[in-house]
């Protein structure tokens, strides 16, 4: 099998953002004159991979009052996760973290051998010590330009309901994926204990999170933050569509409208792009692996969430991506 923990390059022809083709310049979203506090986001730093730790070291705020969302997959080892979040917390006025699947892996090289929910609890306590906001903390409110907005960090996992074509159930979906050589590394390294399955853990998190969301002031705008996409559509551009099984849950398909979101921030897919669903902006903010970002050369590491970046015409590529689509990438996409 491909051991498909991650997808490679998107198929750009599948979806257009309406933004036109991209130019070669990096466009600043800050106005001329005094810089304003900004809510930034990034995900999938994967600092354990050679070449990615310098990326984390390059991240700096534009003002002393900037906040940073870190939307999961910082690293696999607990010491690497601590190093990165501590570095960022010392630079940004507030850091908001949600776990990805990689933080929940327990590998033989990890100095902390805890599994499943106990591992998540360990990471939450670690963040608490550093002053990093997690899904278990009170939701912070952004009151600078673009606000007020409640920032809602979530840990939801997935329940195998993003089914590939030809599958009607989880078991059928896993069989289709296996036939095509696609098996997520999560199946070997991500423990769900004490839950019987990952989908059971997901369903428990959904109930917990919905209750907190239902208690919010429905008039207050929100920024929904989850490692996995809240809707299925972003998965449509993956080279290996079967990987969608490990990418989210259909239970959240209307949360961006139900809970008054002005933006939904996610990562996981390693396809940094901006799209709109039901008029709501979705920002995939991942860095990805060195072999990916070195090839496509993203415009910038940090993504502006608030104030609304108001992307200039031509800034996004022809499917909403934050990188130039090279002829080689187009040629590869035509093979799928």
Q: Where do the protein language model's features map onto the residues?
A:
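Binuclear metal-dependent phosphoesterase catalytic core
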Residues: 36, 130, 236, 242-260, ...
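Short coil/turn segments at beta-strand junctions that form active-site/ligand-binding loops
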Residues: 66, 93, 147-148, 219-221
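Metal-dependent catalytic neighborhoods of phosphoester/phosphodiester hydrolases
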Residues: 51-55, 74-89, 102-129, 143-146, ...
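N-terminal active-site segment of His-dependent metallophosphoesterases
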Residues: 24-97, 103-109, 195
């Amino acid at each position: 099998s491909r051991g498909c923990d991650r997808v490679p390059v998107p198929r750009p022809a599948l979806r257009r953002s309406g933004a036109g083709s991209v130019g070669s310049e990096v466009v600043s979203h800050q106005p001329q004159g005094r810089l304003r506090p900004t809510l930034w986001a990034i995900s999938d730093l994967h600092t354990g991979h050679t070449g990615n730790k310098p990326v984390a070291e390059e991240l700096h705020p534009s003002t002393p009052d900037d906040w940073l969302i870190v939307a999961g997959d910082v690293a696999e080892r607990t010491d690497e996760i601590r190093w990165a979040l501590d570095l960022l917390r010392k630079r940004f006025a507030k850091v908001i973290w949600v776990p990805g699947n990689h933080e929940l892996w327990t590998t033989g090289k990890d100095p902390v051998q805890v599994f499943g929910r106990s591992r998540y609890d360990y990471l939450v306590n670690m963040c608490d010590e550093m002053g990093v906001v997690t899904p278990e903390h009170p939701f912070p409110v952004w009151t600078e330009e673009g606000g007020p907005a409640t920032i809602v960090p979530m840990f939801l996992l997935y329940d195998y309901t993003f089914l590939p074509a030809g599958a009607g159930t989880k078991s059928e979906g896993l069989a289709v994926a296996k036939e095509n050589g696609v098996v997520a590394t999560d199946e070997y390294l991500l423990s769900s204990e004490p839950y019987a399955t990952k989908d059971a853990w997901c369903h428990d998190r959904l109930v917990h999170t919905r209750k907190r969301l239902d208690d919010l002031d429905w008039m207050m705008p929100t920024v929904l933050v989850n490692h996995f996409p809240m809707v299925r559509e972003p998965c449509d551009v993956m080279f290996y569509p079967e990987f969608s099984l490990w990418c989210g849950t259909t239970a959240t398909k209307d949360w961006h409208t139900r809970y008054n979101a002005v933006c939904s921030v996610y990562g996981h897919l390693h396809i940094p792009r901006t799209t709109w669903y039901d008029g709501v902006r979705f920002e995939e903010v991942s860095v990805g692996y060195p072999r990916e970002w070195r090839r496509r050369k993203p415009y910038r590491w940090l993504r502006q969430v608030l104030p609304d970046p108001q992307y200039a015409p031509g800034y996004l590529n022809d499917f909403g991506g934050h990188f130039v689509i090279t002829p080689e990438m187009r040629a590869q996409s035509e093979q799928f």
